[in-house]
């Protein structure tokens, strides 16, 4: 399959079927008490379609969908794979339906990548939670276990955030 055709095919599958989600997990042993966990996934009954997508991105894994083993799930959930393989290739695709969601997802993934080896500021985590909930609001079927207010109360904000341009 030629590259232009392949990219159009993958873009169509992503626009129609992909999930760009960010789970928010309470984890008491973390300083900010919350973990922000981005995941890219596609569910299909055809492994062939998912293998084309997996080979295009060069990362992720295929597995039976839990609770619906007749379906196959393509998942990319390692931060390094999301940042180094998935995001650069998604940047090149002509997404239409998922474009806005992808831009939000990209910002969350790249922020997490930049923070990986630094002391995490809880206010940055708080901002990522807000962006994650905004991303969820783009999908009418999206359901969150906890309200945004409940999550925000859990996160200690240890540093006042200065508005841009003020010093």
Swiss-Prot record:
EC number: 3.1.-.-
InterPro entries (UniProt xref): Homing_endonucl, LAGLIDADG_dom, LAGLIDADG_Endonuclease
Keyword annotations: Endonuclease, Hydrolase, Intron homing, Nuclease
Pfam family, one: LAGLIDADG_1
A GO molecular-function descriptor: endonuclease activity
One of the GO BP terms on file: intron homing
Recorded family membership: Belongs to the LAGLIDADG endonuclease family.
Function: Endonuclease involved in rRNA intron I-gamma homing.
PANTHER family: INTRON-ENCODED ENDONUCLEASE AI3-RELATED
Protein name listed in UniProt: Homing endonuclease I-ApeII
